[in-house]
């Protein structure tokens, strides 16, 4: 039986290694050499792939029934909820899938910062581009239901482009397709929201190819060329375990509290004549929104908001430690958890009204956010080099 099994598996193995298409898949997710000590924190990459598939599948079916017209958009969402078979599930899986996507994304980025994965520059840079494009895709999608928060969120965020000197107003009108957020705006947002997930999928493949070239990082941050295992079955089984746990949590959210992370204002149809009391984006944008609000100057706020994302590109260049990750760096580890707390504080501040004491707390939290990347990260690396690797003699 063993001989039969081995003889039977050899043609399959040969086929997957020699076939021009399957050989690429084989190199990326089957025979990929992976460090033997990866923890469950490395599961979030596969979970992001699952989230993207769920979002694309539910999004395609939702698009079959959605109308990108300002007079029909809100009603078409209502039609999906009431009249389309399992339309309510499609919508709730898509809406909450975005939240799960960003939850996994923030864990994935946090793990990369903690374990120093940014030292693999190509993989990291493609990942940051993916992160920014995902935020753009989510923003475009949030506008589509054409509720109050959708309309006013689109108005406020697109208006930020007017802060660009000289050409800002022209850019805003070009984005709107007119002199205000209108039917042209909704149409182009829907078109781009449908397109960008396919761009994300393509960039995801590029991300994997870069990872295949440079190799995976690991929890202790040392070279692991002599201690590697094939990705399948060692890590595919681990990924499946994570996927099952994720699906249980995701389904619990969708079935038991589908509107928990939504905004009640978005159940009211968009009305350009009535401004909501408090305009705020979805929870996964709140940290950047809090940074935007913390700076009184409009252009300064816009620059700070975009800088809060683009600053991730600088991490490989501000890394001064001789150690890759924070596993053996006591000072930097404390600073990292302060930064995580600061991120959550900014998220909370972003959903609070613009009044004291929230304004000053938001400003202090914003200062610490940038100080972590630009000051603490290189400074603590330098200090730890002196403490952990003292010069002899």
Curated annotation (Swiss-Prot):
One Pfam entry name: Cytochrom_B_C
Cofactors named for this entry: heme b
The UniProt record lists the keyword Protease: no
Main location: mitochondrion
Family matches, as InterPro entries: Cyt_b/b6_C, Cyt_b/b6_C_sf, Cyt_b/b6_N, Cytb/b6-like_sf, Cytochrome_b, Cytochrome_b_C_euk/bac, Cytochrome_b_N_euk/bac, Di-haem_cyt_TM
Location relative to the cell: Mitochondrion inner membrane
Amino acids binding heme b b562: 94, 193
Cellular component terms (Gene Ontology): mitochondrial inner membrane; respiratory chain complex III
Keyword Transport recorded: yes
Keywords: Electron transport, Heme, Iron, Membrane, Metal-binding, Mitochondrion, Mitochondrion inner membrane, Respiratory chain, Transmembrane, Transmembrane helix, Transport, Ubiquinone
Subunit structure: The main subunits of complex b-c1 are: cytochrome b, cytochrome c1 and the Rieske protein.
Free-text comment on the cofactor: Binds 2 heme b groups non-covalently.
This protein's encoding gene: MT-CYB
Membrane topology: Multi-pass membrane protein
Transmembrane segments: 44-64, 88-109, 124-144, 189-209, 237-257, 299-319, 331-351, 358-379
Similarity-based family: Belongs to the cytochrome b family.
Residues engaged in binding a ubiquinone: 212
Extra facts: Heme 1 (or BL or b562) is low-potential and absorbs at about 562 nm, and heme 2 (or BH or b566) is high-potential and absorbs at about 566 nm.
Binding site for heme b b566: 108, 207
Organism, scientific name: Metridium senile (Brown sea anemone)
Name of protein: Cytochrome b
GO molecular function terms attached to this record: metal ion binding; ubiquinol-cytochrome-c reductase activity
Role: Component of the ubiquinol-cytochrome c reductase complex (complex III or cytochrome b-c1 complex) that is part of the mitochondrial respiratory chain. The b-c1 complex mediates electron transfer from ubiquinol to cytochrome c. Contributes to the generation of a proton gradient across the mitochondrial membrane that is then used for ATP synthesis.
GO biological process: mitochondrial electron transport, ubiquinol to cytochrome c
